Amino acid sequence: MGLPLRSLEELGAQLSFYGRSLAWTGRTLRRYKKEILRLLAEVSFGRGALAVVGGTVGVIAFLSFFTGTEVGLQGYAALNQLGTSNFVAFLSAYFNTREIAPLVAGLALSATVGAGFTAQLGAMRISEETDALEVMGVPSLPFLVTTRMIAGFVAVIPLYVVGLLSSYFAARTITTGYYGQSAGTYDHYFQQYLPPVDVLWSFGKVIVFAVVIILVHCYYGYYASGGPAGVGVAVGRAVRTSIVAINLLDFFLSLAIWGANTTVRIAG
């Protein structure tokens, strides 16, 4: 079988896996509430070394803070050359909300929660724990995959609130504290160029990212093979696939939401 056919077969297997995982959502919510709650805590605050930095919430907050700082630094420096430094708040309201914060949140989820899920499911597959669940009459797909998808779906909303506010705070702090721009001027333009609907769409993008990331990572972990080395290979493949998926989704979602019209008008 040639490479194109193998790739098509792999894509079909993945889509079938995603569909079956989503189809189990209703029954999983009824049957496995305790497991979902346990995973919620793990997704938000992490375990082991990840818990030291505050879990996923800490990673997203730190990454968003520093990207927001860069938006403030570079935005002010560039606009100041044109005599329009007052509009640096527009950059924060526009780019952080629509593109930067959602992408940062997606990458953070992939690197922390997603990679962890792949390793967990891969280890369970290698040690035959997944098969043991089936022998005991527990469907492994909803118990291992759908529960994680639901936990990620619920957890990503407060996580993203922290990340988005962190990026806003960083851009404002660097602009008003370091460059000395009036806080009133910054807040005026920030509020003028931040329509609430953009924030809602931003949350919508992140929710889609979270579901896709977790499904991709769970797929590679669920079907891992080849011993401990195979788990490492599965994690690498999952991270690469999820990063590509995030960027493709970001492009098409942004095109669908803001491609034909815009909620922000600078002139005219």
Please annotate each region the language model reported.
Residues 1-38, 220-225:
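Short, membrane-interfacial amphipathic segments enriched in basic
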Residues 27-37, 41-56, 243:
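Membrane-interface helix starts
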Residues 48, 52, 100, 104, ...:
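Selective transmembrane-helix segments that form parts of the transport pathway or gating/packing helices
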Residues 50-69, 249-252:
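Hydrophobic alpha-helical transmembrane segments of multi-pass membrane transport/permease proteins
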Residues 67-97, 162-207, 216-235, 260-268:
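Membrane-interfacial helix-loop-helix connectors in multipass membrane proteins
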Residues 85-131, 216:
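Hydrophobic alpha-helical transmembrane segments of multi-pass membrane transport proteins
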Residues 121-146, 228-231:
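Short cytoplasmic-facing helical segments at TM-TM junctions of multi-pass membrane proteins
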Residues 221, 244, 248-264:
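Membrane-helix cytosolic exit motif
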